[in-house]
């Protein structure tokens, strides 16, 4: 929806964890403003941003109904679902099924796929291969888990399209980027692409691209090795990585 007269502000960058709440905002038909956070330029460590989230991470939602900034993508999804009365079943067991799979995304899918991205696509030459191999094995198990589950159902949890689908779908784009065969995960790919065809999801991706892509590219090009070390929590300076293999969503 339009940013004109928006009272909701979502701070973020191009990443799956920011895409998740943008999809929810669009699915709910809410007016909101996206604000780019120049993470490669260390904006997340400024006093102004740390006042929004002391952890120095995106996304962060500002909503007058909350009375305080809200960080963590899963918490934002849950809040918006509760606020609007949408995409989260009211009754158990469907409600807890959706919440369980939201937690699977937050505790396993996002962190593990994120680590595989770092160690397989962004680590410096000569890096110890153990980490990449470990996270690849975990990712393979997670992608298989999702494909197996979606062979028997249309949606991830609860019987209908829900916040669990919104949480997991942006991460499913990494299947091929991580070197896995899409044809070996047909149910996962069908589900991913069916969600991608939803008008609200297309609007969300367009808004994210318009707000984040050029701005992020500019700050990334200007970032020093030390800036990137701090962003990636690297313990020693290494040559700036070639980001061409990674599409920030």
What are these regions (language model features)?
Residues 208-249:
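Acidic/histidine-enriched, glycine/proline-rich intrinsically disordered or flexible terminal extensions
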Residues 174, 191, 204-205, 212:
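Polyanion-binding and phosphate-handling cores
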Residues 10-12, 167-170, 206:
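Short beta-strand segments
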Residues 108-199, 247-249:
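GST-like fold's C-terminal all-alpha helical module
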Residues 1-133, 147, 235, 239-249:
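GST-like domain detector, emphasizing the conserved glutathione-binding G-site
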Residues 39-40, 190, 210:
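Positions that flank functional sites
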Residues 51, 197, 206:
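Phosphate-coordinating loops and pocket residues in cytosolic domains that bind phosphorylated ligands
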């Amino acid at each position: 929806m339009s940013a004109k007269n928006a009272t909701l502000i979502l701070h973020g960058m191009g990443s799956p964890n920011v895409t998740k709440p943008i999809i929810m905002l669009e699915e709910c038909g809410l007016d909101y403003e996206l604000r780019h956070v120049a993470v490669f330029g260390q904006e997340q460590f400024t006093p102004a941003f740390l006042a929004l989230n002391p952890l120095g991470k995106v996304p962060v939602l500002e909503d007058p109904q909350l009375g305080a900034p809200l960080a963590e993508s899963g918490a934002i999804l849950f809040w918006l679902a509760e606020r609007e009365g949408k995409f989260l079943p009211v009754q158990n067991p469907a409600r807890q099924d959706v919440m369980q799979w939201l937690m699977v995304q937050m505790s396993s899918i996002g962190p593990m796929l994120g680590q595989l991205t770092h160690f397989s696509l962004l680590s410096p030459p000569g890096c110890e291969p153990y980490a990449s191999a470990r996270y690849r094995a975990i990712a393979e198990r997670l992608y298989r888990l999702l494909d197996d589950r979606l062979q028997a159902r249309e949606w991830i949890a609860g019987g209908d399209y829900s916040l669990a689908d919104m949480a997991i779908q942006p991460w499913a784009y990494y299947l091929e980027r991580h070197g896995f065969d899409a044809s070996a995960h047909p149910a996962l790919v069908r589900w991913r692409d069916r969600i991608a065809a939803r008008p609200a999801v297309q609007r969300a991706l367009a808004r994210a691209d318009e707000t984040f892509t050029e701005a992020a590219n500019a700050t990334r090009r200007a970032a020093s090795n030390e800036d990137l070390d701090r962003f990636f929590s690297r313990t020693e300076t290494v040559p700036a990585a070639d980001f061409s293999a990674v599409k920030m969503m």
